[in-house]
Amino acid sequence: MARIAGVDLPKKKRIEYALTYIYGIGLKTSRDILSAVNISLDKRVQELSEDEVSLISKKIQESYAVEGDLRKKVTMDIKALMDLGSYRGLRHRKGLPVRGQTTKNNARTRKGKRKTVGSASK
């Protein structure tokens, strides 16, 4: 089993899809990496040699932010928005949708379960 960027890649999958198991690498990025190091998209992970795995690993390290580094960067970007006091930062702080979605009836994913208000009977 190949291990790249701290992630065990599934053996039987094609390498272009297996690389998408790494946080921060999608299908297009995966294909770009493989074309840069001249590895066929049809190869399975179990068919890769150690040299090919190290080539892929080196390319990812030098060109892309993945896994922990990327998660840390996203967290820091959100924290910076909150510290600035921007509208987006305030929405993050309040746990509400950030990108303009309506919140009168929806937004349950961000707001959580409904809170009961008032009493049921008089």
Curated annotation (Swiss-Prot):
Residue ranges, compositional bias (Basic residues): 107-116
Stored SUPFAM superfamilies: S13-like H2TH domain (SSF46946)
Keywords: Ribonucleoprotein, Ribosomal protein, RNA-binding, rRNA-binding, tRNA-binding
A Pfam match: Ribosomal_S13
A single MF term (Gene Ontology): rRNA binding
Disulfide bonds: none
One of the record's GO cellular component terms: cytosol
Region Disordered, annotated ranges: 93-122
Assembly, per entry: Part of the 30S ribosomal subunit. Forms a loose heterodimer with protein S19. Forms two bridges to the 50S subunit in the 70S ribosome.
NCBIfam families: uS13_bact
Recorded family membership: Belongs to the universal ribosomal protein uS13 family.
Annotated protein name in UniProt: Small ribosomal subunit protein uS13
Organism for this UniProt entry: Wolinella succinogenes (strain ATCC 29543 / DSM 1740 / CCUG 13145 / JCM 31913 / LMG 7466 / NCTC 11488 / FDC 602W) (Vibrio succinogenes)
